Amino acid sequence: MQVELLNDQGLSSSKVDVSDTVFGREYNESLIHQVIVAFQANARQGTRAQKDREQVRHSTKKPFKQKGTGRARAGMTSSPLWRGGGRIFPNMPDENFTHKINKKMYRAGMASIFSQLAREGRLAVVDSLTVDSPKTKVLADKFKAMNLNSVLVIADQVDENLYLASRNLVNILVVEPRYADPLSLVHYKKVLVTKAAMDQLKEMFA
């Protein structure tokens, strides 16, 4: 498998050979779906909470007498049928949203995503990506010159200048290979990988 090598203007200067094990796999939609769903589920805080009929503030006094009013009988105002009453099946903060996915499946899913990106021309290689100062404008101008407005950069090493320059840019994310996730890979229109990061990705997902 070959992918484009981009210059500073975002133009293809040549092609580089990449590992078929990581970038030449068949597209497995169901596996990719599993990997992304598991990633999103495991990222949930699980802190949402609602109150049931015991937890809402209420009085145990009977709202009105049992008979003679023509209304349906009611025992207390905390009933889920009443405004301000508790939920029947409330969301509780101890709910576990964890989705287990095997390491082999995760590696295969990530490799399938990288392979599809390469086939679609959304994956490209750059020699390196550095900035001399932690200025957002410097990095923004660099991507503007490359005609990129939605890009995930996987760099072998993200120094302080690069991190500070990129963190305030919309639709730009710079990460190291170990922090690359399936959701970001499919979200951004273009994925740039430095040459050194390519070797790390091969070790991680081969």
UniProtKB/Swiss-Prot annotation:
Annotated Pfam families: Ribosomal_L4 (PF00573)
Skewed-composition ranges (Basic residues): 58-70
GO molecular function, one term: structural constituent of ribosome
Quaternary structure and partners: Part of the 50S ribosomal subunit.
NCBIfam families xref list: rplD_bact
Function: One of the primary rRNA binding proteins, this protein initially binds near the 5'-end of the 23S rRNA. It is important during the early stages of 50S assembly. It makes multiple contacts with different domains of the 23S rRNA in the assembled 50S subunit and ribosome. Forms part of the polypeptide exit tunnel.
Similarity comment: family membership: Belongs to the universal ribosomal protein uL4 family.
Annotated protein name in UniProt: Large ribosomal subunit protein uL4
Gene source species: Polaromonas naphthalenivorans (strain CJ2)
Classification lineage: Bacteria, Pseudomonadati, Pseudomonadota, Betaproteobacteria, Burkholderiales
Name of the coding gene: rplD
